[in-house]
Structure formats: C-alpha cells, structure tokens
C-alpha cells in the first residue's frame, strides 16, 4: 500500500511538471511572409503623354522588378480580379475616348429617303451589278489574288472586288430653335443603319427610320476623338502584391504553379478593342501557346511573333462632316456627299499560312484537346449569324468602327475550295472589304451607341496581329473547328491572366512553449536591417517557419519601411496629377489607393493592440493553444502552408486572445486600485474620510429603513387582531399633562366622558416613552442580528470543521508520507555515502599496494640495469686474470 502511494505521488508530480513545462501557448508573430487573395482596386501607370491617357493613369517610372518565390500557388485567368478590372477599366477608357454622350431620341422620326438621289452617286447600282453578274451555271473559282507593299492597287484604292460604301440620302422636318416653326434637314446614312418601308416603284422616296430607334440607350458622340491605343501597367496599392505564374506550361488555369514571382506592378499591356484578332499585344513570344478556359471551349491563342503577322487598314475618300443644330444644346452631325465614297478595306501581311499551321499543331499537343490529330481536318471558320460584331471582324481605326467580311481571308489562309460558295465570297485574297457603321453594339455592356459620321480625309491604321480569339469544337474525332469569337474580354485574360492579386498578411499565429512575460529586464540582440523594399521580406516565403522567425524583427521593419516608401511614391505622382484627376473615373481609384496602405497598417496594429501585442514583433500570450495535435514543423513548413492549416482556428484564437486581453486589463485595473492601500498615509486622506462618512450614512439609512419595514409589518399584524392607532403609544405609556385654561374664555360644554368638570385643568395622552420603545426595539433588532450572525458562523464552523479535520488529516498523511520518503532518501543517501567511503578506502588500499609492488619491481629493474656495467667489468677482470 505504501509503495502504491509513493507511485501515485510520483505520477502526480510528473503530471504537474508536464502541465507546467509542456503546455503550448499562442504566440503572435508580426512580419511573416504570408498572403491571401484580394479584390481591391488597382491603379494604372503609363508613359503615354497624350491628354486623355495621362488623365486616366499615373506617370510610369519603369522601376518594377520581380522576385522569385519558392512556393506553390493556384492561378486562373478567368476567375481573376486583375483581368476583370482590366476589362472594366479599358471599357471606361474606350468610352472616355470615343465619348457617346447625347441621347438621340429627337431623331427617332420618319425620314424621307430619296432613291433617285442615292442612285445618282451610284451607291446602289454597284451592288446590284455585282449581284446580277454572277453566272447561273457551275461557279468557277477566281485566280488567287494577293497584295503587298508594292502593289499599285494599294495606292490607288482600286484592288479587285472593292466597292463603294452603300449610303442613302434622307430628309426630315424638325422643330428647331423656334418651337412653332419646323425646319427641313438633310442627312446621309449608311444603308445598314436604316430600316425602310418598301413602296411602289414609281415613287422616288421611301419612308425610313433609324435602326434601333426604340433602344433607349442610343447615344451620339459629343465630339470626335481618336481611339489611339495606349500601353499601361497595373500596380498594387502598398500592402498588396501581384503574384505571377512564370511557368511556360501555364495555359490559363493551373492549380499548382511552382514557378511563382512577385512584383508590385504588372508588365506593360495594350488597350485592345477588336473581335477575332488581338492587335499589338505584349505577350507574343517565339512560340505559339494557348490559354484554354478551365470548363468550356473558350480559348485565346497567342501567335508566334516570328511570322511577323500584320494587318493594315485604310479608309479612302474625302468626306465632309457638318453640324446640324436641332435645338438648343443639341447638335447632330451630318455628312453631305462631296465625292464618290469608296469602301474601307484591310490587308494582311506576314506568313499567315505557316502561323495558322503552327496553331493547329499546338492545339493537337494541348492536354485539353481530345479531337483528331490530323491537322488537315482542323479548320479555321467564321461564326454563323449573330450581331455584326460576331459575323464580321470588328475593330477601331482612328475612332472609326470597321466591320470587315473575312471570307476572302479565310479562303486564302485555309486554301479552301470556293466553288461551293456564294458568288461574292468566291475569292481567295489576303485583303478583305470593310464598311463603317455609326450604330454599334457595345462590347462590354448590353446596349447600342451612335457615333459621328467618319472624319474627313484618308484614315490608315497599321497593327501587329498577336493573338487569335476562338472557340475550339470537335465531334467524334473527325473534324475540329476553330471558330473565331467576338469575346473582346479574352484579350485581357491573355495579357494579365498569369497574375493574381494578394493581400500581405504579416500577422501569424503559432504555438510555442513560452508564456507571456515582460521584456523590461531582458536584452535583445541588435540586428542590422537590410531594406529590400516592400516586397523584399517575401523572399523568405519559401523558407521554413523557424528560419523566418529568426529574422521577423528585421522583416517587420522592412515591411513598414516599404509601405511608407511606396505610399510616398504614390502620393508624389498623385500630387503631380491632381489637376487632371479631378474629373476622371480612374482618378478616384488612384486617390482611393493612396490611403489603402496606411489603413491596412493601422488595422494590423489595432488588431495587435486588441491582443496586447502592439508594436511587438514576437508576442507571447497566456492563451493555451486550442489544438494540441496541430503543431507546425518549424524546419519544413512555410508560413503560407501553416496559415492554410490553421485557417479554421483563426476566428476561435482571435476571440480567445481578445478575451484574454480584456481580462488582463481588468486585472491591471484591480491591481492599480490595490496599490492605493499600500501606503498607510492614504488611509487618512480627506477623500478617503469622505468615503467613510458616506459608508456610515448608508449604514444608518439602511438600518432606519429596515426598522420602518419591521414596524410596518408588526402594525399590520396587530391590525388583524383589532384596531389601534398606528402612532399611539403602547398600553400603559400615558402621562397626564396639565394645562391651565384661561378663565376669560367661555367654558366648553361638557361632553360624555369629561367627568363633569368645567374647571381649568385637563390631561391628554403624550407618547413620551416612545423613544425609549424605539431604542429597545433597535437593541432587540441588533441583538437578533448578532445572534443570527453568531448562529450562522457557528453552523459554518460546524460544517467546515469536518472538512478542515479531513484536510488536516490528509495534510498529516502527506507530511508523514513525505517524511517517510525523506527518511528513505536520507537512509539511502547515508548508505550510498558509506558505500562510497568504503569503496574509496578499498580503492586507496588497492592502489597503495599496487603502487608499492610496482615501485619495488621498478626499483629492482633499475638496480639490475645499473648493475650491468659492473657485471661486465667483473667479467672482464676474471677473463684477464
């Protein structure tokens, strides 16, 4: 039994030691390299110096470097806030440049369009001539027709198959500046922008309406602007960063990209607005690669820049644009016909056939593709039906909107058999006809805009074709179609799809064995800070947690210094542009990012302050770690991996830290209040005596109120037995008070019970003993309170006495056990001491004997060696004798 008690005691002691030294507590680290996905607005920087471009973006200083990270991150070009912001912002740029702003509801009227006036310019005869000239027999394909820089038809604008623009002259009456007087106006429309009613052939006029007139969002351009594309880059606000997947195998979606770099800004990109093709992109390389949507067949194909693919468009003619004042503050621009207008057209240069062949080969090698491997069965096709922007290749040239019919180009690139096509499409050419529209469908939002007629003079645009927008479809592995697409937004998924925006989260939580302590008496190793800039501390993102914690102080300083530096740079450029930023959409975004970094830093410090860790790099907390089975591998885990593991615990840990800090503040407050009692002089302070007087008054008032309540209860109990005045004295407490009546006053008539005397003395009851009665009642009350308190204390003592006795007995037993154990230890120690002494004596004796024997042996050996010469001499002497 005693042995069992000893074992139990040892187990309890070991568990206590384990509970003290092995409990892990929450530790807060500030300056760790971790992040999470973010969706805040980015700001734009550009080197373009034209007015509207600099109004929209901040000046670009070109100092943006990338830093490689040893981490794995997921990337998606379609679920990406960077690409979504680019699409929205480029649309804002587009509208700012082209400016459709005046609603055209006054022009939704009936117009009289003169057919003979239109025919006089040959605007309709050419089309009918071409239509009727088609033979009805088996069609014959025309000879391949190509143009280049030296072709004469380029300069003369008379290449084969090009026509005149189909236009119609119309008149309409409207009320002008005078409300009661109408005025007739002339206007020339593109035939595709009008809807006319068919009338008899003898009538030269037709009733026509502007197309899409019932659409409420139709707007006319206030002013004619060029849509010159600009190159710009996106930059993250301070406290945020841009990660980029640097893997050459990245195809728009990669859940585990291991080649990640970080920067504060993206690469330069181009503001492209076109269907089918992407122009002047910045992602072209000496290879062809594909961005493929993760869930459907949408793709954006980057073309190999080795083939030098170009597209050059031209709008010939000498048009004149005149303003027509409809009413005050509303001007509509008309284009009278001064010369025979010619059709716009575009021609394609470079090794297009080789480029498309490489595109097909790249599709076959793509892991998402499961169609035929025969590139001859992969065809480049035009979409069928839909809006004009889908059916035609739509682009913008110097502010004009070109719609190009691409059949000739597709026939040329694919070497198609044109014998089965319609007569007008039966050509294989490297140029295509285009026409200009005033009413276009908006590419970003549902709606239509009306723009000014084309500007005067020749218009020429030269572009480099860098990408191809297409949907790839295949059926049964026999045929694959590369269908050209009108998704303008895909261009920006190619430009910025390898980026993702993240928010730096420098606060990390991890379990350690250290509890909260004060650092007032401790010393710190001073460490020199090597400022890498704001993103420098992310270089340790791929390092283990233990290695990062060593440098967390330097990293937190680097983080703050980088935020302040980046904030100052942004503030400087905003100051330089403040006059131009007042009326722009992006100006508001830029000003918004100006305060983001400081807000983020203050938010982090407020959170640290709520935990009692303000301005500390490593802060130990008294809160135990809530999940003992979840601990970091300090030598292998990175902070980013550890943050993902404990993400589900973060909310719970945060609540525990706040509760612990609140309790800590309460304890400090109570401790400070107790500090005022440690000085004896404070007990006699005037403020203290005022409090004592208040406490005394409270006691007196309480006793009085209690007595009143008791008296009322007693009176109510007496009333149940019979009536007696509440304030009358108890029985037998009466004293007669004699009063002398004035003889001059009339004598009061006798009453019943007066005794028949009308004399001068009378008596009435007075409660003179009532005060004595109250005193006795108060004494009785105090006696009752004293007896009850004494009874309560005696009962408490009686209840606690067995517990105290058992506790005392337990303590005695523990003391006996400890004394027994101590006796055992003392006996064992004495036995051990005696054994050591005996061993020492035995060893000493043994060593002494061994040393004597050894010394004797050495002495004899020495004597024998010393005797050798003497023996030799003696031998020689004997020999000589």
Swiss-Prot record:
What's the source species' lineage?
Viruses, Riboviria, Pararnavirae, Artverviricota, Revtraviricetes
Q: Where is this motif: YXXV motif?
A: 723-726
The molecule here is called Envelope glycoprotein gp160
GO BP annotations, alphabetical order: membrane fusion involved in viral entry into host cell; symbiont entry into host cell; virion attachment to host cell
Can you tell which superkingdom this protein's organism belongs to? Viruses
The remark listed among the other comments is: This is a macaque isolate.
The region called V4 is annotated at: 404-434
**Which parts of the sequence are annotated with region: MPER?**
673-694
Gene encoding it? env
Which positions are tagged coiled coil? 636-668
Disulfide bond positions: 44-57, 101-222, 108-213, 113-170, 235-265, 245-257, 313-346, 397-461, 404-434
What residue intervals traverse the membrane?
697-717
Q: How is it modified after translation?
A: Specific enzymatic cleavages in vivo yield mature proteins. Envelope glycoproteins are synthesized as an inactive precursor that is heavily N-glycosylated and processed likely by host cell furin in the Golgi to yield the mature SU and TM proteins. The cleavage site between SU and TM requires the minimal sequence [KR]-X-[KR]-R.
Please indicate the ranges of residues that lie on the Extracellular side.
Answer: 23-696
Q: Which portions of the sequence form the region V2?
A: 170-213
UniProt note: domains: Some of the most genetically diverse regions of the viral genome are present in Env. They are called variable regions 1 through 5 (V1 through V5).
State the UniProt keywords alphabetically.
Apoptosis, Cleavage on pair of basic residues, Coiled coil, Disulfide bond, Fusion of virus membrane with host membrane, Glycoprotein, Host cell membrane, Host endosome, Host membrane, Host-virus interaction, Lipoprotein, Membrane, Palmitate, Signal, Transmembrane, Transmembrane helix, Viral attachment to host cell, Viral envelope protein, Viral penetration into host cytoplasm, Virion, Virus entry into host cell
Residues annotated as site: Cleavage? 527-528
InterPro entries for this protein: Gp120_core_sf (IPR036377), GP41-like (IPR000328), HIV1_Gp120 (IPR000777)
